[in-house]
Amino acid sequence: MIVRVCMGSSCHLKGSYEVVRRFQELQKKYNFKLYGSLCFGNCSQGVCVEIDGRLFSRVTPENAEEILKKVLQNG
């Protein structure tokens, strides 16, 4: 699984650094690759995260694990 977190200015202002830190904590448990990314073009809905090509919006440190579980369950 590949997780890409938007590091664009809008997402940065909305907390992308904290989201990255949360995903770093979750890496050992869920075994995925984590990358920073340029803007996904959905700035008003940030923080945006792409997981295996699927875009998620309004990602927070609090809902990051729930999103990972959803992707793993639904493929």
Swiss-Prot record:
Its cofactor is [2Fe-2S] cluster. [2Fe-2S] cluster binds at C6, C11, C39, C43. Keywords: 2Fe-2S, Iron, Iron-sulfur, Metal-binding. GO terms for molecular function: 2 iron, 2 sulfur cluster binding; metal ion binding. Might be part of a multi-protein complex, possibly involved in metal cluster assembly. It comes from the Bacteria. Binds 1 [2Fe-2S] cluster. InterPro entries: Thioredoxin-like_sf (IPR036249). Disulfide bonds: none annotated. It comes from Thermotoga maritima (strain ATCC 43589 / DSM 3109 / JCM 10099 / NBRC 100826 / MSB8). Pfam families: 2Fe-2S_thioredx. Not very thermostable. CDD domains: TRX_Fd_family (cd02980). This is Protein TM_1420.
